Amino acid sequence: MLKVINLNKSIKNNKNTFKILENINLEVKDGEFISIMGPSGAGKTTLLNIMSTIDRPSEGKVYYDNEDVHSLKNKELSRFRRDNIGFIFQDYNLLDNMSIEDNIALPLVIANEKPDEIQKEVEKLASFFGIKKHLKSYPYELSGGQKQRVAAARAIITSPSIIFADEPTGSLDSKSASELLNCLKEMNKKFNVTIIMVTHDAFTASYSDKIIFIKDGRLNTRIDSNGNRKDFFKQIMNLLTSMGGEVSEFI
């Protein structure tokens, strides 16, 4: 379980201090698929970065199973991140000079796992994400959707308890986005991995179980899916319209 308690984030510019996040309190249960939405500049990615240990809060705590992760020393934090967290970014972050097979395997290679175990895991995940025939290819030979599925396979190969995804469909066309989101949804259920995803897109968010809305650095509201994605999408759109801003701020 992940808990965020009284989290604040500020930045200083000359003599001025700007609040990015203010008094954030949040609890994420194991196995949940949560989206974070909000207007541009609301603090979505900053919150994601703090929860994923990429950034630190100015005040407040982030707990994973009652452990204050931001109190860990550098080596301990690196080990914790390696063992518990996976990342998916909008721009894939694949290594162009490595094959798809090697890109997926990289976290296990770094962890000094046995080669035969690595190969077994790579092939299993490549089949799951529908990219097995591309294992000997290189990133430049794949479409954006295929590259993002490679990134997703790499993110989960270490069996993390939680995956953070920052605008994972932002560079994809609608067909590729749907394919990736179906994979993430199935991955969430099959592997019981928690997913926290930042997105500006209502269609993308409709694949999650719960949506948290941030506005002006504060948690604004939350809605839960009833299990019907089309109904959830309509619910999201209605809420965006009622939040006092233009829908275009979010989409």
Residue ranges of predicted features:
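Catalytic Walker B motif of ABC-type/P-loop ATPase nucleotide-binding domains
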Residues: 163-166
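A short, proline-enriched helix->beta-strand linker immediately N-terminal to the Walker B motif
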Residues: 157-161
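Conserved ABC transporter NBD signature motif
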Residues: 60-68
